[in-house]
Amino acid sequence: MANIKSAKKRALQSEKSRKHNASRRTMMRTFIKKVVVAIEAANKEVATAEFVKLQSVLDSYATKGLINKNTAARKKSRLSAKIKAL
């Protein structure tokens, strides 16, 4: 455990952000799963509607640094291609 005051503070901040980011990552995976389930059910309307929401989430997380911007672009590109193939 840290002995220096600033190190203790950083440890607390790190733990807080870890929990916050874990929650956000779970939410992101849920959005992705909704799109994938709609694609597997061949429901283009629902898949498109969920994909619009997902794009917003991925872009905001890429901006905030939760995921890399290229990761966000790759996920959007692959899901978009699957939706277009329906």
Swiss-Prot record:
Sequence segments annotated as region (Disordered): 1-26
Gene3D superfamilies: Ribosomal protein S20 (1.20.58.110)
UniProt cross-references to PANTHER family, sorted A to Z: 30S RIBOSOMAL PROTEIN S20, SMALL RIBOSOMAL SUBUNIT PROTEIN BS20C
Protein name per the record: Small ribosomal subunit protein bS20
Alphabetized UniProt keyword annotations: Ribonucleoprotein, Ribosomal protein, RNA-binding, rRNA-binding
Family: Belongs to the bacterial ribosomal protein bS20 family.
A GO CC term assigned to this protein in UniProt: cytosol
Cited NCBIfam families: S20
GO annotation terms (biological process): translation
GO molecular function: small ribosomal subunit rRNA binding; structural constituent of ribosome
Purpose of the protein: Binds directly to 16S ribosomal RNA.
